């Protein structure tokens, strides 16, 4: 059996992450789904993860630190996706009120309101607009972030004794 190395694992994760990014842009531009604030935060986490994987492919030095940061970013993405799943599970009368688009929020509202919408979500985050095999988009995102967090933690413990 071939040995799984740090770079092979990170390369595989980078390929999965690129596929997730392509899927998110496909759903936005080809399928016409507008991302809610929590979706945007999840996308930011995916881009940060891809950047970390790119850094880790360049050098194996400090791989344990990169893996720990990868774990933390994946946990942040997991928070955003679980928050959105929770909002989607609320009855319609308990869901938060819809807010204007992010561009309008940034232009006309104070930064505290923008930050609250980005970190806590809004009414449009509670809408289920797309499912695959009965699982909504934040459910798939939660599975992705959970797998990235587990692999980040695994790589952290595996590489901290090497470096």
Swiss-Prot record:
Residue ranges crossing the lipid bilayer per the database entry: 10-26, 45-58, 65-82, 140-158
S-S bridge residues: 36-39, 98-125
GO molecular function, one term: protein-disulfide reductase activity
Stretches of the chain forming a coiled coil according to its record: none
Recorded topology in the membrane: Multi-pass membrane protein
GO biological process, one term: protein folding
InterPro entries: DiS_bond_form_DsbB/BdbC (IPR003752), Disulphide_bond_form_DsbB (IPR022920), DsbB (IPR050183), DsbB-like_sf (IPR023380)
Periplasmic side: 27-44, 83-139
Cellular component, GO, one term: plasma membrane
This protein's record includes keyword Magnesium: no
Membrane topology (Cytoplasmic): 1-9, 59-64, 159-163
UniProt main location, coarse: membrane
Subcellular location: Cell inner membrane
Keywords assigned by UniProt, alphabetized: Cell inner membrane, Cell membrane, Chaperone, Disulfide bond, Electron transport, Membrane, Oxidoreductase, Redox-active center, Transmembrane, Transmembrane helix, Transport
Domain of life from the UniProt record: Bacteria
SUPFAM superfamilies, per database record: DsbB-like (SSF158442)
UniProt-listed Pfam families: DsbB (PF02600)
PANTHER family named among the record's database cross-references: DISULFIDE BOND FORMATION PROTEIN B (PTHR36570:SF3)
Family statement: Belongs to the DsbB family.
Function: Required for disulfide bond formation in some periplasmic proteins. Acts by oxidizing the DsbA protein.
Name recorded for this polypeptide: Disulfide bond formation protein B
């Amino acid at each position: 059996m071939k040995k799984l190395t740090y770079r092979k694992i990170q390369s595989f994760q980078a390929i999965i992450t690129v596929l997730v990014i392509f899927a998110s842009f496909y759903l936005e531009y080809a399928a016409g789904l507008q991302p809610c604030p929590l979706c945007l935060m999840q996308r930011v986490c995916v881009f940060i993860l891809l950047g970390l994987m790119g850094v880790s492919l360049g050098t194996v030095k400090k791989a344990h630190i990169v893996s720990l940061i990868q774990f933390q970013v994946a946990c942040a993405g997991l928070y955003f996706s679980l928050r959105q799943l929770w909002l989607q599970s609320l009855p319609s009368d308990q869901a938060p009120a819809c807010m204007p688009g992010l561009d309008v929020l940034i232009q006309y509202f104070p930064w505290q309101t923008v930050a609250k919408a980005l970190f806590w979500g809004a009414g449009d985050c509670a809408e289920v607009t797309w499912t695959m095999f009965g699982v909504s988009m934040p459910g798939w995102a939660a599975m992705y972030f959970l797998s990235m967090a587990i692999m980040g933690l695994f790589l952290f413990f595996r590489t901290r004794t090497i470096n």
